[in-house]
Regions:
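NAD(P)+-binding Rossmann beta1-loop-alpha1 motif at the extreme N-terminus of oxidoreductases
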Residues: 1-65, 83-93
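Beta-loop-alpha module in the N-terminal Rossmann-like domain of NAD(P)-dependent dehydrogenases
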Residues: 65-79
Length: 93
């Protein structure tokens, strides 16, 4: 299964690290490029923007959002909603 992961703090990066060895493809993004590079070294596909993340995901897309609750999460879900299409899924973690 292919999954987009937005937010690579402790929880998001550890989720991706658990999914990768189980054979899942993770396409990852974080505003901080460091954890993106770390996960690329572990087999994830890194991206530098939400646009690039959405572009690299196959339809129907599934994107797991692991950013802090509140305005940041609301804005991220809103921004993804503008880029995704009917049939795509956002998981707000």
């Amino acid at each position: 299964m292919q999954l987009g992961m937005v937010g690579l703090g402790r929880m998001g990066s550890n989720l991706a690290r658990r999914l990768l060895p189980a054979g899942h493809e993770c396409v990852v993004f974080d505003v901080n490029p460091s954890p993106v590079k770390e996960l690329e070294a572990e087999g994830a596909t890194g991206t530098g923007s939400l646009d690039e993340l959405v572009e690299k995901l196959e339809k129907p897309r599934a994107v797991w959002v692991m950013v802090p609750a509140g305005q940041i999460a609301e804005q991220t879900v809103h921004d993804l909603g503008e880029r995704l299409e009917p049939g795509d899924t956002i998981i707000d973690g």
